């Protein structure tokens, strides 16, 4: 991939605006660090530009809260093309999605949508465990590019958690709504699917993910009792 790509540059700008003011859970680290790391992992693994861009954009739509009028205002202030888009949450999301398809193509947006969790159905908030089981089920039949994107996403999350545990201890797991054993179950499940199904040069991501999840399991061993840390299935991130 070229050292500079106008498409990658635009994707970074959109992600920076979309994640403005957001931080990584339990930290003061700007959230934009996550999609940038995910994109870098994908690039290093040899994935093509559409997949790298999907890594940059993978959380933009998922994290666009329906009642976040301020986020919609930020998008309009930076991107004049959104001036004519409806201001209601549904209309704005549809307009932004249409623009992303126009600028980055169906392939990139199909990848983004494949890893975007549906947090609500008919106005009902979905339980954490329900969403994660669905995500794992989708991976069982996903194509290589989707598996690579998911592996890079989870790999950076696990690496970040391990670094935070090294710095501040396993107590940092309390920042998550899911219990430590639920979190580890989900990451292990993703690693197992990717390990079985991700082939070619991108299989290195699956190997790194497997090692990272193993390191997380070691870091958490003996610190949490599954019988007391399990939370209800309504746990959400």
Q: Regions from the language model: what does each represent?
A:
Residues 1-237:
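Active-site helical microenvironments for divalent-metal-assisted chemistry
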